[in-house]
A protein has these predicted regions:
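Serine-esterase "nucleophile elbow" of acetyl-processing enzymes
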Residues: 1-44, 56-63
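Structural recognition of the beta-strand scaffold that forms the well-ordered cores
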Residues: 5-7, 37-40, 66-70, 104-109, ...
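Solvent-exposed loop/turn segments at secondary-structure junctions
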Residues: 11-14, 44-48, 73-77, 111-115, ...
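Short, solvent-exposed loop/turn segments at secondary-structure boundaries
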Residues: 17-19, 79-84, 116-121
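Acidic/histidine-rich helix-loop elements
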Residues: 38-49, 77-82, 170
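Oxyanion-hole/transition-state-stabilizing segment in secreted/luminal serine hydrolases
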Residues: 49-87, 106, 111-114
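Active-site segments of SGNH/GDSL-like serine hydrolases
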Residues: 70-74, 95-127
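Catalytic His-Asp segment of secreted/periplasmic serine-dependent ester chemistry enzymes
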Residues: 114-194
Length: 194
């Protein structure tokens, strides 16, 4: 369905998918005359491999008009794989989505603060995710949330405001971070829809 937005994500969207749900609510409130439906699978309990295995039912079968993907964090946190291994699974899923659909696909980068034990792993994973745009520059857009967060943090430091923590010490998003991501998604998606 042209007006259905499918969101597939992990803890990037919050412990219970708060950012995805807030984004849906913001879009419905701000665009009251736009017919839109949401299918939200965030946080997805499945691994990247399981999402790939079930892609025909859980992703392609949803018949979305737009797909937003925010994955990779859970796989890194789980351990056993570095960013190479995580991206191999991520890319396999991305290829499946791009080969079996004709709709716009948006891939989100993950802020480094969400994996404080090895932020360089997220930096490297994000660089790989950014490279996905080359697969189909008309359909694929990178929503660079990691860069957006870095810019926000820099502006906070310039102003001397330290009271707005986006993440806890162990990298979990705070309530303000979930709202921040929801607003960011709204801005990006509306820009793409117009």
């Amino acid at each position: 369905m042209e007006n259905r937005i499918l969101i597939i994500g992990d803890e990037l969207f919050g412990e219970q998918g708060e950012a995805a749900n807030r984004f849906a609510e913001i879009l419905l409130c701000r665009e009251a005359n736009r017919p839109v439906q949401f299918s939200i699978n965030a946080p997805a309990p499945q691994t990247l491999q399981q999402l790939y295995d079930r892609a025909s039912a859980d992703i392609i079968g949803k018949k979305a008009g737009r797909i937003i993907v925010g994955l990779g964090l859970k796989e890194l946190k789980r351990g056993g794989k570095d960013y190479h291994g995580v991206f191999a699974s991520y890319q396999k899923l991305a290829d499946e989505i791009l080969n079996k659909t004709l709709v716009p696909v948006h891939f989100l980068t993950v802020p480094e603060d969400m994996f404080p034990v090895a932020p360089s792993q997220l930096t490297a994973l994000n660089d790989c995710i950014r490279g996905l745009q080359q697969k189909d520059e008309k359909r694929v857009k990178i929503f660079d949330f990691a860069a957006y967060v870095a810019d926000f943090k820099e502006k906070q430091l310039e102003r001397g405001k330290f009271g707005r923590s986006l993440y806890t010490e162990d990298g979990n998003p705070t309530s303000i971070c979930n709202t921040f991501l929801a607003l960011y998604l709204y801005d990006c998606v509306i820009k793409e829809m117009k």
